[in-house]
Amino acid sequence: MTIRLMENFRAIFYAPYYAIQTLGFYKSEGVDVALVTSDTPGDAVAHLINGTIDLAWAGPMRVMMAHERDLASSLVSFGEVVSRDPFFLIGNCDSFELSKLAELRFASVAEVPTPWMCLQHDLRETGINPDAIKRVSDRTMADNYAALRKGELDVMQAFEPFVSMAEMDRAGKLLYAASARGPTVYTAFIATRDAIARHREAFAAITRALAKMEQWLYDNSAEELAKAVAPSFGHVPDDILVASLRRYRDADLWARNPAMSKQGFSRLSSSFVSGGLLKRSPAYETCVEESLC
């Protein structure tokens, strides 16, 4: 049987999900995994519930929100991959501090909610009211990067490859790495409990493959990882891809084992509560399937 795995969206920080297939770790565990692309970020949940896919990778936010809407939701996360926040602030400011953000022309990520939710929580913890910050919140990262290059923005929030591009283009520099805050569970597998019951052996094999992949990440160079994922990022120049992956690897972005961090889960849910996305923090045990790890 083939497990249908849906991609959330294409991003360099998802490199382990592409490399695990290229390097044959699924195959070595005797499981066949077919990658399915999604139309928009977040639409995997509907596909999981109606059974058109078996598994997806996404932020635990999707699971947390599902449980807030329905206490009996069958959605769960397992197999942590991205264990820190992969977003950055990029700009041309000297001696930047978060407290200066209110004085600057700033654009946050519009494509998905988690980056801003996490950043606004960082701001609150430093005594800054995020509601007092004027920000552009309705443009893509690509559009914001174009504005940064033209001098129409001072600071933008983005993931790689925009940091490495900005450095190479001399359009800006790294001002703030959200990964530095520490564990924040950003991406894992999600499935329904029914699917886990049906495919327990296959999902256990996928988790074992993931453990091998995560060990490989820190035993090999960014150049080797770039070779493994290059087919998924044909539009990214080789030097930019390597620089992006090295930055993430050096930041300890990826988990070193598949068990989901309770500290990282708590940090993420607290960010959603303070930002108004959730009314209360969900229980770890309700949202995480621990038996597979």
What annotation goes with each model-predicted range?
Residues Q21, L48, H67-E68, L148, ...:
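Hydrophobic residues in alpha-helical segments
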Residues Y18, M64, Q120, S164-E167, ...:
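Predominant activation on well-ordered alpha-helical scaffold segments within soluble catalytic domains
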Residues T2-I128, R135-D138, D154-E160, K173-L174, ...:
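Short, glycine-/small- and polar/acidic-enriched structural segments
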Residues I53, W57, R149-K150, Y248-K262, ...:
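Short amphipathic alpha-helical segments at helix boundaries and their inter-helical linkers
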Residues M1-A34, A255, F265-C293:
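N-terminal hydrophobic or amphipathic helices and topogenic motifs
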Residues A197-K279:
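Secondary-structure end/capping motifs
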Residues D143-F233:
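Pocket-lining segment of extracytoplasmic ligand-binding domains
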